Amino acid sequence: MTTVKFKYKGEEKEVDISKIKKVWRVGKMISFTYDDNGKTGRGAVSEKDAPKELLEKLEKK
């Protein structure tokens, strides 16, 4: 599966694209929420670093 690598509060994180629930654009950044073992995690990645699967989820909404 495809994963998204991002930094959140200075910490490197990686999340599987299948766990991502909601995706939206903020300027040139792609923000998203994901299922973090029952909790809701948040993340953001620049548009140029986002995998194409994440961009496809953005287009579908």
From Swiss-Prot:
Q: Which domain of life is it from?
A: Archaea
Q: Name one GO molecular function term.
A: RNA endonuclease activity
Thermal properties: Hyperthermostable.
GO cellular component annotations, sorted alphabetically?
A: cytoplasm
**Gene3D superfamilies in the cross-refs:** 2.40.50.40
- Does the record's keyword annotation contain Cytoplasm? yes
Which keywords label this protein? Cytoplasm, DNA-binding
Similarity comment: family membership: Belongs to the 7 kDa DNA-binding/endoribonuclease P2 family.
Protein name (record): DNA-binding protein 7a
What ranges does the record give for the region Disordered, renumbered to this chain?
Answer: 37-61
Q: Where in the cell is it found?
A: Cytoplasm
Task: Please give the organism.
Answer: Acidianus hospitalis (strain W1)
